[in-house]
From Swiss-Prot:
Disulphide linkage map: none
GO biological process, one term: glycyl-tRNA aminoacylation
EC number: 6.1.1.14
Family of the protein in this entry: Belongs to the class-II aminoacyl-tRNA synthetase family.
Name of the featured protein: Glycine--tRNA ligase alpha subunit
Top EC class of this enzyme: ligase
């Protein structure tokens, strides 16, 4: 199997899906917990207009902070997201061919689709789904997006999310993310993943778990919540959705700090879900659907 570097994996996926006909978008410039939170998925999966895109999305999950000491769990990581709307009949075949373009021989490796229906409580999103396992390691999530913001997706969109670090661990045959070959160079130009990202991993873990100001974050959440509602009323759902994302990330920070009780957690999830819903409803209203 050809051992692509981390950046070569990204380039190969971009080229593959570009050749299929996807527009290659850029990462969204906000703190999100997954590629699904990009407005190119949340808002564009709604409505009847066709939409085929692919993009890398840096993602943050404060609760996964491990100071860079865990072999494959980080508070900051990368996903590659593909949205095909309407979902083509051969989407599974397209996905498997994308693995082949990464040098994975499907005849020599055990590729399994393990049923795992997907749900995002904060987005009010859900769909039939499968985890994709390669020789026992999860490398992707495959979902038929049926609902976002509590609104049915018509037509249903196909979503493929590649876990880039896990995929790279398998392709390169290494055990720790920090040891991944980032750029495929040798000698002085060679870079490992750890040299690029792990000092930030250490510092942000300390911030997420030790230094974050919970009182300030509680104010930030309330401010983002109020601003989101105000902007929806002002007919700018894209700007409002940014505030929804801020509220969602702030909730994740508070959760990582352990300052939210079980009961409060459920309440916060409902509040963020409401923000996502009103953004989605306003987006559809302005789209004439």
């Amino acid at each position: 199997m050809k051992k692509l570097s981390f950046q070569q994996i990204i380039l190969a996926l971009q080229n593959y899906w570009q050749d299929y006909g996807c527009a290659i978008l850029q990462p969204y410039d906000a703190h999100v917990g997954a590629g699904t939170f990009h407005p190119a998925t949340v808002l564009r999966c709604l409505g009847s207009k066709p939409w085929s895109v692919a993009y890398v999305q840096p993602s943050r999950r404060p609760g996964d902070s491990r100071y860079g000491m865990h072999p494959n769990r980080m508070q900051h990581y990368y996903q590659f997201q593909v949205i095909l709307k309407p979902s083509p009949d051969n989407i599974q075949e397209l996905y498997l061919k994308s693995l082949e373009c990464l040098g994975i021989d499907l005849k020599k490796h055990d590729i399994r689709f393990v049923e795992d229906d997907w749900e995002s409580p904060t987005l009010g999103a859900a769909g039939l789904g499968w985890e994709v396992w390669c020789n026992g390691m999860e490398v992707s999530q495959f979902t038929y997006m049926q609902q976002i913001g509590g609104i049915e997706c018509r037509p249903v969109a196909g979503e493929i999310t590649y876990g880039l670090e896990r995929l790279a661990l398998y392709i390169q045959g290494v055990d720790e993310v920090k040891e991944l070959d980032w750029n495929g160079q040798i000698g002085e130009k060679a870079l490992k993943y750890g040299e690029v990202d792990f000092e930030a991993e250490r510092q942000f873990s300390k911030y997420n778990l030790e230094l974050a100001n919970s009182k300030m974050l509680l104010r930030h959440f309330k401010d983002s919540e109020e601003e989101c509602k105000r902007l929806v009323d002002g007919d700018v759902p894209l700007a409002a959705y940014d505030e929804c994302l801020k509220a969602s990330h702030t909730f994740n920070q508070l959760n990582a700090l352990g300052v939210i009780s079980v009961t409060e957690r459920a309440s916060y999830i409902l509040r963020v879900r409401h923000l996502a819903k009103i953004c989605c409803m306003k987006w559809l209203e302005l789209s004439g659907e």
